[in-house]
Amino acid sequence: CTLALHGEDALDNLPTDQRLARYAQGNADNGLEELYFAFGRYLLAGCSRPGTLPANLQGIWNDDFHPAWDGKYTININTEMNYWPAEVTNLPEMHQPLFQMVKELSESAQGTARTLYDCRGWTVHHNTDLWRMAGPVDGASYVWPLGGAWLSQHLWQHYLYTGDQAFLQTAYPALKGAADFFLDFLVEHPKYGWMVCAPSMSPEQGPPGTGTMLTAGCTMDTQIVLDALTSVPVSYTHLRAHETSQDL
């Protein structure tokens, strides 16, 4: 998979740092954009091979006893972002380590959903690790139980790109479990009457002047819930499962 934007041949002879400096000043460089496209694919191919661990913020090499971000997976956007190129740039094989992690979390994190929220399904918060930790960590504002649902949408995206029915059959329990959690977790907004997540937050952001990141039914959470609750019935239809849509 390559990106052809037809840049100027003369710029290809410039060192990359000079091209970056030119680009930062507003000069067009289609060839540099092609190079960055290839660089993104290279990074994913270099740190997420089938049979290995998923890509994280730290990278695959570490010389510290206490690595950056503890070497964990930050799943309130960073892990997902690492894999945004996987399907669209034709690297589906590099998605496999993430799929394995999601499958394992969908099993281990059922206890988290049940114990912390008395909900069905499974849920993960903003961090996980080698041992598939699923509970909230760090400050109170990170009680954000939508990490699993967001991760699960990578399974659905892979199916949309590939049409692989066998894959969808194996992915369906994780997709359904992520959606089941919201059937029990959502509550009615006291002012508007909508069914929303509460507590809810857009990770690492908050309304100015409030002193908190917590709210009820923030836009990001609502979109994740919508994706989870709509992908499952469509999956069911595609698989011709032996369930009724009400059971989903």
For every predicted segment, state its role.
Residues R22-N27, W84, N90-L146, W150, ...:
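Active-site lining segments of carbohydrate-active enzymes
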Residues I77-E87, P145-W156, M220-S231:
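Well-ordered alpha-helical segments within folded domains of soluble proteins
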